[in-house]
């Protein structure tokens, strides 16, 4: 592992979205995007109710299926087929950013101001999530880390 997921999100939050950056995953073979034209695009799924309480848990299942926390208000952003190597091309990362941003905007429109993130995400998605979380939009942002058999609080981004 390159670094714990919560620390990658913290790194992303420090870089922010104003600085241009390209984040690659750490593939087994090389530090380059996959050039194969038949590389399948990931398909992301999320559903956000029209109204939510101020504080919610957001499960993010991309590299694996993340266990849901013991919380009454849980929403999920996930990929159809979780896989550690799911983001293979820059286009895939752009699709992820676009879809995850739509997820965040729906949370805000639904009334969420305090968010607890429960991620199972690859390197690039972890850093990008940190870059995309708008500190002026959310009052508090908490990231949890899976330490079997449960989630443990790891870092507060805001």
Question: Which residues fall in each region the model found?
Answer:
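Redox- and metal-dependent alpha/beta enzyme cores, enriched for Fe-S-associated oxidoreductases
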Residues: 38-103
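Short, basic/hydrophobic alpha-helical segments
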Residues: 1, 98-113
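Short Gly/Thr/Asp-enriched flexible loops that form oxyanion-binding sites at enzyme active sites
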Residues: 7-16, 126-134
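Long, charge-dense
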Residues: 16-46, 89, 140-158
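Gly/Ser/Thr-rich loops at beta-strand to alpha-helix junctions
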Residues: 2-9, 61-66, 116-127
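Hydrophobic beta-strand segments of well-ordered beta-sheets in folded domains
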Residues: 1, 20-21, 54-58, 74-75, ...
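C-terminal functional regions that serve as terminal interaction/effector modules
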Residues: 106-114, 119-158
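Short, well-structured alpha-helical interface segments that form or flank functional binding sites
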Residues: 6, 95-99, 112, 124
């Amino acid at each position: 592992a390159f670094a714990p997921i919560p620390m990658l999100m913290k790194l992303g939050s420090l870089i922010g979205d104003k600085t241009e950056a390209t984040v690659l995953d750490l593939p087994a073979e090389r530090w380059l995007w996959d050039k194969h034209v038949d590389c399948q695009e990931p398909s992301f799924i999320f559903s956000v109710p029209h109204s939510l309480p101020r504080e919610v848990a957001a499960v993010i299942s991309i590299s694996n299926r993340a266990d849901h926390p013991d919380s009454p208000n849980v929403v999920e952003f996930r990929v159809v087929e979780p896989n550690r190597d799911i983001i293979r091309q820059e286009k895939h990362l752009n699709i992820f950013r676009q879809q995850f941003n739509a997820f965040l905007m729906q949370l805000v429109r639904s009334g969420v101001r305090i968010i607890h993130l429960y991620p199972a995400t690859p390197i690039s998605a972890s850093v990008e999530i940190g870059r995309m979380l708008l500190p002026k939009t959310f009052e508090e942002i908490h990231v949890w880390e899976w330490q079997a058999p449960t989630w443990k609080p790891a870092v507060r981004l805001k």
